A protein has these predicted regions:
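Short, charged/polar "capping" segments at the starts of alpha-helices
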Residues: 34-37, 108-109, 156
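Rossmann-like NAD(P)(H) cofactor-binding subdomain of soluble oxidoreductases
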Residues: 52-136
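NAD(P)+-binding Rossmann beta1-loop-alpha1 motif at the extreme N-terminus of oxidoreductases
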Residues: 1-51
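Short, well-ordered alpha-helices that flank and scaffold nucleotide-derived cofactor binding pockets
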Residues: 17, 21, 86-90, 113, ...
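NAD(P)-dependent Rossmann-like dehydrogenase/reductase catalytic/cofactor-binding core
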Residues: 218-313
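Residues at the C-termini of beta-strands that transition into short coil/loop
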Residues: 30, 49, 63, 102, ...
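Internal alpha-helical scaffold of NAD(P)-dependent oxidoreductase catalytic cores
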Residues: 90-91, 113-121, 134-238
Length: 313
């Protein structure tokens, strides 16, 4: 199976690198700067679960992409999706499967609008990693899980073939799911709650718990779960219990990646994670925590845009 990994950042680089390590036929679609970095230093993974280095990994540029692949693994930020689709369009053929690992659910509609629904799979991952200053992928803990499946829950021939490439021997915890839409919704509920409350409080979980805001975190989780239920995907009790425990854990250093991006002055996936969920609410409440968190992040984005505009004058 020929696998195209779109980008070689923290997520795509990690999972693609582990697939390379396991002997899979992997090519990275990268921009010229990242291509030069990989040619010079190789693909480097530093992880508690084992380091990996592949000198001169297989790469291709958008301009040189000439034929379809069997599987496209997509892990870009949601705000980069349009450009990413343009870059890998020539890799999508009649039998190509696209496995996106983006946050939220809106990307499924965007991808289907471009390529049709046939190629699309559902997918999600759990990993904490970043790209170091030297271009190495730094993995922080022992979590490196990826679940995937047909969006209708079927066990198609193609999903079984993909599972044979990924499950058990790919160098990370891969799992074929018959309920991938449910799992994607449960993850969205959690990350929206975590992003919303840590960004709103501008603090780690432990800090806002110490300040007495545990009830706000729990309330935001309940609100997000209610929206999911209204869409037909009531989060299961076990998923809610795990999320509640994480979001109310005393002393926890956890910050959502959205807050880390805000602290770094970077772009954020505010509309994809928070705004889209808010729009799906049956009866939006002007004083809802989700609305307040969404507007808080929008204000950051507006201020960031104003700052960039002023800097160009």
């Amino acid at each position: 199976m020929r696998i195209l990994v779109v980008g070689a950042g923290a997520v795509g680089g990690y999972f693609g690198g582990r697939l390379l390590e396991a002997g899979r036929d992997v090519t990275f679609l990268v921009r010229p700067r990242r291509a030069a970095e990989l040619a010079k230093n190789g693909l480097i993974i530093r992880s508690p679960l084992g380091d990996f280095h592949r000198p001169s990994p297989p790469v291709v540029s958008r301009e040189d992409l000439a034929e379809p692949f069997d599987l496209v693994l997509l892990s870009c930020k949601a705000y980069d999706l349009d450009g990413a689709m343009d870059s890998f369009a020539k890799a999508v053929g009649e039998s190509t499967a696209i496995l996106p690992l983006l946050n939220g659910m809106r990307h499924l509609d965007v991808l289907a609008g471009r390529f049709g629904p046939k190629p699309l799979l559902g997918g999600q991952c759990v990993i904490s990693a970043t790209l170091g200053g030297d271009g190495a992928i730094v993995h922080f803990n022992d979590m490196h899980a990826l679940s995937f499946g047909e969006l209708d829950g079927s066990r198609s021939k193609r999903i079984e073939t993909i599972a044979s490439e990924l499950v058990g021997t790919a160098g990370f915890d891969a799992r074929l799911s018959d309920e991938i839409r449910q799992e994607m919704w449960e993850k969205w509920v959690f990350i929206a709650s975590a992003a919303g409350i840590t960004s709103l409080m501008r603090s780690s979980v432990g800090a806002y718990v110490a300040a007495g805001a545990s009830d706000l975190a729990a309330g935001l989780l309940d609100e997000c779960a209610g929206i999911a239920a209204g869409e037909g995907f009531q989060p299961r009790e076990a998923a809610l219990a795990r999320a509640r425990a994480v979001l109310t854990a005393a002393g926890s250093p956890l910050k959502a990646s959205m807050l880390r991006d805000i602290e770094g002055g970077k772009p954020v996936e505010g509309d994809q994670i928070l705004g889209d969920l808010l729009r799906r609410a049956a009866k939006p409440d002007d004083r809802s925590l989700l609305r307040i968190a969404t507007l808080h992040v929008r204000a950051y984005e507006a201020q960031r845009t104003l700052g960039e505009t002023s800097a160009k004058r």
